[in-house]
Amino acid sequence: MAKKVFKRLEKLFSKIQNDKAYGVEQGVEVVKSLASAKFDETVEVALRLGVDPRHADQMVRGAVVLPHGTGKKVRVAVFAKDIKQDEAKNAGADVVGGDDLAEEIKNGRIDFDMVIATPDMMAVVGKVGRILGPKGLMPNPKTGTVTMDIAKAVTNAKSGQVNFRVDKKGNVHAPIGKASFPEEKIKENMLELVKTINRLKPSSAKGKYIRNAALSLTMSPSVSLDAQELMDIK
């Protein structure tokens, strides 16, 4: 088994020039050629930003609706009441509730990928914050998941919204499609993500904003990208 894995990786590494930072177009082409798993692998971009997340004014966080989605079916839970519950259901939310939903979550129900809430329900959401927070599911105004426009938020989530935030080391990881996507769709998704991240550059960040960038599949080595080319995307 280990021998098979080693041979597979060796074959994949042979397709990459380790000392080269690829342009977006060529990088996408190379990473697609690395698809070798028996399932449709996720394409992920990783960026190392020149920020210090220990400072609140350098915390890069946001959301972007990818033009071609992520290729993943997203289950959405909504905390709302009265007419807003109806709006959520009509927009296609999978789970809708209030205190009852909070109780279900306390009892172990986490069968959704994104949580949206109206502002007046955040006190209820707060009761399960310790459960949702570590899973990256806590609603936040910066990602458009705390809003009165529930229908739009649910539609965005279902259409391929990706929420992102910089980690303690200044890295951002985000899915931008599947290996089965045409190269052009992966490229357009990545450009939309990078454009959004560039717009969120903190004014206090110094030096190069995008220090390193890489593209990879679920089961593949990473392909280095030209960070300067990404910083020039507006």
Curated annotation (Swiss-Prot):
Listed GO biological process terms = regulation of translation; translation
Q: Pfam families under this entry?
A: Ribosomal_L1
At the top level, the lineage of the source is Bacteria
Claim: Ligase is one of the keywords in the record? no
SUPFAM superfamilies to which the protein is assigned, alphabetical: Ribosomal protein L1 (SSF56808)
Q: Name one GO cellular component term.
A: cytosolic large ribosomal subunit
Which UniProt keyword terms apply here? Repressor, Ribonucleoprotein, Ribosomal protein, RNA-binding, rRNA-binding, Translation regulation, tRNA-binding
What GO molecular function annotations does the UniProt record carry, in alphabetical order?
A: rRNA binding; structural constituent of ribosome; tRNA binding
The answer to whether keyword RNA-binding applies is yes
Matching entries from PROSITE patterns are given as: RIBOSOMAL_L1 (PS01199)
Q: What does this protein do?
A: Binds directly to 23S rRNA. The L1 stalk is quite mobile in the ribosome, and is involved in E site tRNA release. Protein L1 is also a translational repressor protein, it controls the translation of the L11 operon by binding to its mRNA.
Query: How does this polypeptide assemble, per the annotation?
Result: Part of the 50S ribosomal subunit.
Q: Which NCBIfam families match?
A: rplA_bact
Family, as annotated: Belongs to the universal ribosomal protein uL1 family.
Under what name is this protein listed?
Large ribosomal subunit protein uL1
**Originating organism:** Helicobacter pylori (strain G27)
